[in-house]
Curated annotation (Swiss-Prot):
GO terms for cellular component: mitochondrial inner membrane. This is Cytochrome c oxidase subunit 5C. Keywords: Membrane, Mitochondrion, Mitochondrion inner membrane, Transmembrane, Transmembrane helix. It is found in: Mitochondrion inner membrane. Coiled coil: none annotated. Belongs to the cytochrome c oxidase subunit 5C family. It comes from Oryza sativa subsp. japonica. This protein is one of the nuclear-coded polypeptide chains of cytochrome c oxidase, the terminal oxidase in mitochondrial electron transport. The lineage of its organism: Eukaryota, Viridiplantae, Streptophyta, Embryophyta, Tracheophyta. InterPro entries: COX5C (IPR008432).
Length: 63
């Protein structure tokens, strides 16, 4: 038989450096998205209170 040698995939252990880099990248991306969400909420809140202070809106129901 000529097919005595078969190329098998060799399994390697986990690469610590690669896992640290992937974890760091995912953490930074998730943190950046979280910060952008909070900046957007802060902008909305600041805009609401500015409009409330200027009298453009009111929280009291008019009868």
């Amino acid at each position: 038989m000529a097919g005595g040698r078969i190329a098998h995939a060799t399994l390697k252990g986990p690469s610590v450096v690669k896992e640290i880099c992937i974890g760091l990248t995912l953490g930074l991306v998730a943190g950046g998205l979280w910060k952008m969400h909070h900046w957007n909420e802060q902008r909305k809140t600041r805009s609401f209170y500015d409009m409330l202070e200027k009298g453009q809106i009111s929280v009291v129901v008019e009868e």
